Amino acid sequence: MIYFDITKTGSSGHRSGLMRVSSRLRQQLGAAATEVIWHRGALKRASDKTALTFTPSDWFLTSELFSEEERPGFANFLASRPCQLAAIYHDAIPLKHPHITWPQSVARHPAYLKLLSRFDHVWAVSQASREELQGFWLWLGTDGNPPVEVLNLGADFDGSARLTTPERPAASSGQPQLLCLGIIEPRKNQSMLLETCDELWRERLAFELHVVGRVNPHFGPPIVARLKMLQREHGSKLQFHEGASDERVAERYAAARATVFPTLAEGCGLPLLESLWRGVPCVCSDLPVLRENADGGGCLPVAVNDFASWKIALRRILTDDAFHAQLRAEAVSRPLPTWAEAACTLLRGLGV
């Protein structure tokens, strides 16, 4: 039996990348998994909060972030090893970028990474994350660390069929549309994107930018304030869709000429994969973690946070029809991972 941890994801009202990973894996694991939560110092069945009886062949599987402070007694649970332990590791962004990360996340992360070393098996969401985690353990000097393999996350984010024909986007306004998805915060770097688009609009380049995402209440308001200021100046060329449903997001994909992903740091970069699933080329930051998927085609990597390079790249994707058609053809024809395949990888690794 796989006991699948939904302590946070089962009650969360927003749809972050971590929530997406948990929900899609849970769907694909189906009857092989039972949902559990950490409740009052013990792991319990999520449906009725009853106690669990483990056998040595059972697995506890979590894709969540945790600490002893958030889950009193969890460290003792790991030490007692009532069953086998497996985890999915995302990234060390709170340690690498503490100035733009929730203080609670920054405080939690060192202990979280250390607790991961007590598991029997860990999957990292990218090769970059795998090397990152192993490097942290090496620096920390932990002994008996578990094997870490790469789990390729799915591109089929909402279970929809993949677009496999290079159709042209249906932009109702007649102007090409760029789509930027992700939480509004400094790490996602919408500020640089807004300034780049502002300059292109001032140079009379006709296009729309659609920004979709919830606002990080700690870091997002200044970005939203700048966005609204530019909206007053440029009107309908800049549109903000906060908290859009999956259906609204699908509409935006259908109208998009390209997605733009100027992020400063990622564990995997699901927006890139999800864009390709929709057959939409992605202009993305030239991060090693994103290159793991971008190099397969359909993407235009651009130097991280380089205003001049992004301006050139956006102008090219908006005006060079032959280049855009090439990227679209690559996007719809290249192989892409699915959540069903990710679940199969886990089942094989767990021997279930």
What residue ranges belong to the model's regions?
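Carbohydrate transferase catalytic cores enriched for Leloir-type hexosyltransferases
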Residues: M1-V352
